[in-house]
Regions:
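Hydrophobic transmembrane alpha-helices and their helix-loop junctions in integral membrane proteins
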Residues: 1-197, 201-226, 230
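Cytoplasmic/organellar membrane-interface segments at the starts of transmembrane helices
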Residues: 170, 226-291
Length: 291
């Protein structure tokens, strides 16, 4: 086993932190993510949101915690302050965006920083919530980028102002969009609710202030998610061209189906996932608290 002095741990932890925090991404290293999502095709955004962002949080669990347990505990206040600021800041920023993809990109930053709060609570509940929320975010964010891909294929613009009244032309699309909007704001019965609730309970054991700030971010998340859904789906048809929109094709519907199943199954039966995580999380915490 590796053994580093306290000073070595601090230095090496910061080096690892620089790379993992950029990947998560944490404030202020988050600026690349909205730009990447805007430039990427739909498939690229789905892979980025569903898989690649999780490599940052996985890096902390797999490398930073076991290799540098002292430094991980030492720098917890730094991570808490950065993550809590990011949750509120990116939620407020998302409300001001005009590009559909940018809105979802900023929500991704907010949710992944909530995961960081759960990880650095260093208790079983917080870590289980963080891992569950990582999985949930993979389903929900990927589906929301697919939702935007569906309307972009038909209208070839991502500007919010050109959409409205799609419920009249695309009822099935509206139902699917509603499911994932509710999941994005952590409605009970969806996967995000379990993950975010466990994160807040775990964080409450360590720091009530951070828990309050994280919960504020969740409230703001409800604001921009419902605003976006209402803006695209309800109201009058903005242009005559929108009347030519067709509802989801079979191909598109079957792409959404496994994501709907994963989101609802994880929300109703989280213990299937929690039981698998329990032993490994306890082993990880034993290594950290041994310090």
């Amino acid at each position: 086993a590796f053994s580093f002095t306290e000073q070595e741990q601090k230095f090496l932890w910061l080096m690892f932190f620089a790379s993992f925090a950029t990947k998560v991404p944490m404030l202020p290293m988050h600026i690349w993510l909205p730009e990447a999502h805007v430039e990427a095709p739909t498939a690229g955004s789905v892979i980025l949101a569903g898989v690649l962002l999780k490599l940052g949080t996985y890096g902390f669990i797999r490398f930073s915690f076991p290799l540098f347990p002292f430094a991980s505990l030492y720098f917890t206040p730094l991570v808490y302050s950065m993550a809590s600021m990011a949750v509120v800041y990116t939620s407020l920023t998302a409300i001001r965006q005009t590009d559909l993809k940018r809105i979802i990109a900023y929500t991704s930053v907010a949710h992944m920083n909530l995961v960081m709060i759960g990880l650095f609570s260093f208790n079983v509940i917080g870590l289980e919530g963080a891992m569950l929320q990582s999985l949930s975010h993979g389903f929900v964010a990927s589906a929301l980028f697919l939702v935007i891909g569906v309307v972009y294929d038909r209208h070839h613009t991502r500007m919010v102002k050109y959409y409205g009244g799609l419920v009249h032309m695309m009822p099935l699309f509206t139902i699917i969009f509603l499911i994932f909007t509710m999941a994005n704001i952590a409605l009970p019965g969806t996967s995000s609710f379990v993950g975010e609730l466990l994160i807040l309970v775990g964080a409450y054991e360590c720091n009530t202030t951070i828990t309050f700030i994280g919960a504020t971010g969740m409230v703001l998340g409800g604001g921009y998610s419902l605003w976006l859904f209402n803006r695209i789906v309800y109201g009058n048809l903005k242009t005559q061209y929108l009347k030519q929109f067709c509802d989801l094709e079979k191909r598109e519907f079957f792409v959404f189906l496994p994501l709907i199943f994963g989101t609802l199954f994880m929300g109703v039966y989280p213990e299937v996932f929690l039981n698998v995580m329990h032993i490994s999380i306890n082993n990880l915490l034993d290594q950290i608290h041994f310090v």
